[in-house]
Amino acid sequence: MANIKAKKYYSYAKINLFLHILNKRTDGYHNLQTWFTFLDLKDQLTFSFNNSREINISSNISIAAKQDNLVYKAIKKFQQSYRVQDIGVDIEIKKNIPMGAGLGGGSSNAATTLIALRDYYLPQLSNEEMIPLAVKLGADVPIFVYGKSAWAEGIGEILYHKDFSPQYALLIKPDIHISTKEFFTSEDLIKSSVLISKDLGFDKSIMHNDFENVFYAKYPEFSQYLKELDSDFRMTGTGSCFYLLSADKNKLEQLTRKINKPLDKWLVKTLNYVY
C-alpha cells in the first residue's frame, strides 16, 4: 500500500459539445448521445490518509452534509465494491467550479475521489475498470474517471475516445437554476433525437443541446440577450452555464468586455486529457 500522507489532485470541469436525448429507458433513465471535452477550470482535492477510520470532508464553501455529499458516497461505494474496510481520510476540497452549472463539478469530485482511493489502496486497478462503479454515482461520473475527451452513449457510461480541436471557451453563468427533474418533465424537451454517428466531426448544424429549448422557453429575455452577444453560445449539461468556443482568444476577450449584465464569467482553455 502506498504511503500517502497528503496528496493533491485536480478535479476538472467538462462541457457537453452537444447533448441529444434519444428515448426513455425502462429503468427511468434516458438514453443519450453527447460529446464531452474538459476545461482548464478545476477544483483541488487534498487527501490525507490516516489510521483514524474516520472520513472527514471540509471545503472553502458550504457543501452538502456528509451523507449527501458525492465525495462521501464515492468512498462508501469504493468500500463496498472492492471490500476495502476501515478507510481513514481527511479530504479538503477547494472549489472553483461553480455548482449547478452543468460543468460537472460534483461528479468530477466524486471521480477524483475514486482515483485517489484507487492510487492508495488498489494501484493495479485501471481507470476503465472503475467505470461500472462510477456510473452508480451518477451519469456524469464515468467521463471524469475516463479522463479523455469522449463520445458518450447509454446514459453516459459508454465512452469512445474522441479528441476535440483545442480552443478557448468563454463561460457565462446567470443566477438561474432549473432542476434536472423540471427539465425532464418539461413539454418543451424533445426526447426523440435521431441517433447520429460517433464518427462525425463537430457539426453545429445537427449537434445541439436538447435542454436549451426548455431553458429558453422559461427565460426568453436571457435567451435574447445571449443571441445578441453571439448566436453560437451553447448550454452545457442542464445548465445554467453557457459557453462560446473560439480559437481566437482576443475575440472572446473583446466579447467579455461587452457583457453588461451581472453574470459570472470565465475564459479558459479546452482540454482533451486530464490525467
Swiss-Prot record:
GO biological process, one term: isopentenyl diphosphate biosynthetic process, methylerythritol 4-phosphate pathway
SUPFAM superfamilies: GHMP Kinase, C-terminal domain, Ribosomal protein S5 domain 2-like
EC number, as in UniProt: 2.7.1.148
Residue positions binding ATP: 98-108
A Pfam family reported for this protein in Swiss-Prot or TrEMBL: GHMP_kinases_C
InterPro entries linked to this entry: GHMP_kinase_C_dom, GHMP_kinase_C_sf, GHMP_kinase_N_dom, IspE, Ribosomal_Su5_D2-typ_SF, Ribsml_uS5_D2-typ_fold_subgr
Pathway(s) served: Isoprenoid biosynthesis; isopentenyl diphosphate biosynthesis via DXP pathway; isopentenyl diphosphate from 1-deoxy-D-xylulose 5-phosphate: step 3/6
Domain of life: Bacteria
GO molecular function terms noted in the UniProt entry: 4-(cytidine 5'-diphospho)-2-C-methyl-D-erythritol kinase activity; ATP binding
Catalytic activity: 4-CDP-2-C-methyl-D-erythritol + ATP = 4-CDP-2-C-methyl-D-erythritol 2-phosphate + ADP + H(+)
Active-site residues (renumbered): 14, 140
Keywords: ATP-binding, Isoprene biosynthesis, Kinase, Nucleotide-binding, Transferase
Family from the record: Belongs to the GHMP kinase family. IspE subfamily.
Entries under PANTHER family matching the protein: 4-DIPHOSPHOCYTIDYL-2-C-METHYL-D-ERYTHRITOL KINASE, CHLOROPLASTIC (PTHR43527:SF2)
Functional description taken from the UniProt entry: Catalyzes the phosphorylation of the position 2 hydroxy group of 4-diphosphocytidyl-2C-methyl-D-erythritol.
Protein name (database record): 4-diphosphocytidyl-2-C-methyl-D-erythritol kinase
